[in-house]
Regions:
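Active-site-adjacent loop and "lid" segments of alpha/beta metabolic enzymes
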Residues: 3-7, 18-102
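Active-site metal-binding loops of divalent metal-dependent hydrolases
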Residues: 15
Length: 102
């Protein structure tokens, strides 16, 4: 990509796009493997059906599930979280950083 003038790249595994719930969870479970690409990884799990369907809820009521999976993504090496609910995501990142730096 760099040989074609593309320098600002990130990996977005595309949670929710053309995948079953099971495939999305497997992708998240194995997402640490994306670190081998040596590029920042963006995780977009906010309000995804894999969360609210698993919890038998609705997108707007599944914030705790989103936060739990955000923590998993961070622990697996994600660099960027794409979110709808900024304050709870920032709390998650702050707790992750405290854990990582302890």
């Amino acid at each position: 990509a760099k040989s074609h003038g593309l320098y600002d790249l990130i990996i977005d595994p595309g949670y929710g796009f053309a995948k079953t719930t099971e495939q999305n969870f497997k992708l998240l479970k194995e997402s640490s493997l994306l670190q081998s690409l040596d590029l920042p990884v963006l995780t977009g799990l906010s309000r995804k059906s894999m969360i609210y369907k698993t919890l038998d809820s609705t997108a707007d009521k599944a914030l705790n599930g989103t936060t739990a999976l955000h923590m998993q993504a961070l622990l697996s090496g994600s660099h960027i979280l794409r979110v709808h609910d900024v304050a709870p995501a920032q709390e998650c990142v702050s707790l992750f950083e405290a854990l990582r730096n302890s």
